[in-house]
Amino acid sequence: MAPPWVPAVGFTLVPSPGGFLGTQYIRGEGFRWYASLQKPPWHPPRWILAPIWGTLYSAMGYGSYLIWKELGGFSKEAVVPLGLYAGQLALNWAWPPLFFGARQMGWAFVDLLLTGGMAAATAMAWRQVSPPAACLLYPYLAWLAFAAMLNYRMWQDNQGRRSGRRLSE
């Protein structure tokens, strides 16, 4: 049997590989394209994004562990709270290919709205099971709201730059 800390570490790390794979769209031509876009003055500096996402992914991952543990693993009761979590995580991972890969800022904005809605539903479901787990999602919800505003503003400010390109660079 695995030591008791293994599930906590495993769940905490689950969101990170998808986030890491998403960074592949931000390299090379994707980065050059992004650098050429008009950005609002409140656009965050590039260096802060990795620490922010690392923290948010770790918090949501650990929150999912708390839910899993509280509900006795992958039980019938865990289907909705962990299913909502998995759904919002899949939507989260879809954003970089949409924005940077396909260069579809409008569809990326829709994806962020859906991600935010699913993440809010996840937080509400988690609150019924473990209020501390739900609290771990609150910074993520705030960041998603900020990211949606930024995505929308960039989409509107770069009207001529929103046509799609190939997904692979």
UniProtKB/Swiss-Prot annotation:
Main location: mitochondrion
CDD domains hit by this protein: TSPO_MBR
Transmembrane segments: 6-26, 47-67, 80-100, 106-126, 135-155
Similarity remark: Belongs to the TspO/BZRP family.
Membrane topology, Mitochondrial intermembrane segments: 1-5, 68-79, 127-134
Annotated membrane topology: Multi-pass membrane protein
Source species: Ovis aries
Annotated protein name in UniProt: Translocator protein
One Pfam family linked to the record: TspO_MBR
Subunit structure: Interacts with TSPOAP1. Interacts with MOST-1. May interact with STAR.
Coiled-coil intervals, chain numbering: none
InterPro entries: TspO/MBR-related_sf, TspO_MBR
Task of the protein: Promotes the transport of cholesterol across mitochondrial membranes and may play a role in lipid metabolism, but its precise physiological role is controversial. It is apparently not required for steroid hormone biosynthesis. Can bind protoporphyrin IX and may play a role in the transport of porphyrins and heme. Was initially identified as peripheral-type benzodiazepine receptor; can also bind isoquinoline carboxamides.
